[in-house]
């Protein structure tokens, strides 16, 4: 149920149940909220949860897109919301469609967003009335953790007090890439294509050439949308590497364990190099090896020293990413069509953009040609380093010292279990997170298969903690 901030504050004033505030209603926030309700029911715990997001639509950026060409890059068989029910998404699709669902299908992200909404709604029905989850459409301007509570101050005024706050921030919104900051206000430059209204702005642009800065999955999404909006428009993608994400093969292919995965004497970097060598040599099994390495990536990453992680990010991260985060087969086929027809061009290098009189924006291609652009779109993807984020809440948290960036600029500095570390290095007991903010700690943490595991673990820990505090207070009252 959607409620106003005033209604929630009034309810909170009279509520005796512990309160958990979840900031962010994307996949991370929705998965955690559902698991929190399930864990509360199982433990017989009464609690109140408040799910806050400035968007009225659930699903966050990834799963609120309405473009049917935006697909999951994992098969339906791998996208269950529940670690202990791997076929849950497949069965949901069957019930929805009334026919057998294909486990190896790559569903649209919009459909997956509807699934997450259904999962959360079912959890709410099961938990009521002992546990409640209330949704609030509001921007959280500041989070202020204290010894025994957390205060969330809302941009529109007012505040909510919680016993624990889970910041399900997801991927941080895109910011202007280094060197392009002065173009952020240019009418033909789109800094973050996922902001509300920007897709419509892209669709309404003229038929002139469009520059896509980047060549990863965000570029792919934009290219597919632009190809629908502008059937004859020229698309130019440029990135430093010029590397496109690789493609999944059709069908469900079982992961192939790399023989040395369990050998602690073989480093993560050596494993990555072996897999990339297989890919360069044209081996048919490299995809299975990538997927076989995924379940143990976090353990290997944790064993790397700071220096080894820094070298990996500089020397191997991009190459590994294009093999690890692959395109759905039908998406890859469409991108290949666009490239073959010449409608999409792919270049390596750094785009040179020049402001020209009359509000024009001109691109100088590596070969020397100048192109008068209709639009230039930042498609480099989400910001990794929170210090580069323009999000007001992130900036407030950093400035106040309640959180700190990971030393390598990989998300936030977090402790095992998802607690944020403060500026002084101590971890918060009441300010927690999951998913992409933990990339520096875990590396493999941005996709649903990992986030659902974290959501379950975090929910169990939160319920256990709040139940323990409630019992301690009851004991204190009875003996006082």
Write out the residue ranges for each language-model feature.
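Flavin (primarily FAD) cofactor-binding/catalytic cores of flavoenzymes
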Residues: 2-56, 61, 99-266, 272-468, ...
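Redox-cofactor-proximal catalytic regions of oxidoreductases
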Residues: 53-98
